[in-house]
Amino acid sequence: MLLLFDVGNTHTTIALTKDGKSFDIKRVSTHSIQTEDELYVFLKMFYRNDFKDIVVSSVVPNINYIFEFFAEKYLNKKAIFVSAKEYNEIIWNVNTPEEIGADRVVDVIAASRDYGKDAIVVDFGTAITIEVLKENRYEGGVIIPGFNMMVNALFKGTAKLPKVELKPSDTFVGKDTGSNIRIGVINTILGGIDYTIERIKSDYDLKSAPIIYTGGQSKLIREYLKKDIIYDLELGLRGIYYFYENIAC
């Protein structure tokens, strides 16, 4: 069994898998586990200690040592960390491939393996990323503030606007300050994504490319999805598995 970690800025997804198709998933706050010993105690509650390897996709480099120490101390193994430069089945057509976030790398890998050589991926996390895959070449992407980042910016940058909890709305105009913020944030982000995708389709001749939405925050906008959009919450986990498959061969 492989032990996979998808370490995000806010939450970490932990998954156990044998084949990269089905996953036994747990989720924790990223900064709730501070040491390799705490990680061991947490995992022991749910999993047997029979891991073939440990593979980590992390966008929080200052806690990577926890996974390194855990693998060495409790598994007598070296943790494997996702990076674009280690994966050779995709051409990383950007200035500095080593700077591509691991979360983006695994999204692109899984999109390529599961949906074809052309794809557009939108990952709704703390920040929202849009990835462009053209003929199995990663052409780059876009990063925009996530839902909660925009809410927090309004709250911290003004004297009176409240911090609200986001939820879908069936109207485009709010009747109170809270609904004004909710509608404004969600519609601004969705409108920006729609515009960006249309430009990408036109500029890169990707009019028939599949569009995949993923990431924990995508649940907020699931009911707004157009019929041609694919909703795939396990895209990143499969990407981690495919990365391991590639480098283990």
Swiss-Prot record:
Write out the annotated subcellular location.
Cytoplasm
Name of the gene this protein is made from: coaX
- EC number from the UniProt entry: 2.7.1.33
The name under which this protein is listed is Type III pantothenate kinase
Q: What class of enzyme is it?
A: transferase
Tell me the residue numbers annotated for binding K(+): 123
Q: Which HAMAP family match?
A: Pantothen_kinase_3
Which protein family is it in?
Belongs to the type III pantothenate kinase family.
